Amino acid sequence: MYHGHDLKPPFFEGWYYKLINQAEDQRYAIIPGIILGERGHAFIQVLDGIQGTSTYHVFPADQFWAAGDRFEVRIGANTFTPERIVVQIDDEQARLSGELRFDGLSPWPVRWHSPGIMGWYAWVPRMECYHGVLSLDHTIAGSLQVNDQSIDFSAGRGYIEKDWGQSFPEAWVWFQSNHFQSPGTCITASVAVIPWLNSAFRGFIIGVWHQGRLYRFATYTGARIEELLIRDDSVHWVVSDRQYRLEMEATRAQGGLLLGPTRVEMGKRVAETLNASVQVRLARRAGGELFQGTGRFSGLEVHGALERLLAL
């Protein structure tokens, strides 16, 4: 559901739909959202992962509507739910229209003691940024008309997540892929500078969805970072808990620029690619490999004061 009912600025909320067709030669991210404040407005961002270009479409805040009891958002003539999107954009930047439907959604499991990917941190009030995963992997049906090109996404695969709060973090690394050799396998991982009281800590959340089981590693689960190296061309990251060890190597690639929220406006310029790859190895600490593979067409963001992120 939308979290901004009756809230005052600073506040933003955005949803991220990753869309890849069956032929894997069309890759898009569509990001609807809203930011409240003096320069408040609704928006829809569109990232073309093949071309490495993006467009940012602005709507008056009063053209944003959200249901109070479920996730359904409308921005102008555009509709967004977990099961489908309907887009109708025609301005000086781009023309985009069509309907996509999503089947076989795989939401991050929600339990009374762990309400989603953030665990008990989801109950902490006034955190800078909250995160949620609506579907780790699903199939797509339908098509989009993008300018003069008709793109059939039927039998493609998608992913949906969301962010909300006051601002994006000072620094973070995020990557995601659900295009492994074994269909349905997905990884989503992020590490960021998290303000806490008068200080900050390095918080992380990782989920590996494989063969119908979710392996989670997070600050709140007691997992720890063994290695985190950010290079010009890659991110090397190793985490472990009492049972498992997870090795990840994300290869960076060219992408496009998205706008991200500050406490005042959509002022962060965030480089994101849909052309990265991520090598994953999950094993039991006692011995025995559970999964090894390379995720294609990974979304990847590496942003902000990385020296501070690494130093925490």
Label each residue range with its predicted role.
Residues 1-312:
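Structured soluble/peripheral alpha/beta segments that form catalytic or ligand/cofactor-binding pockets
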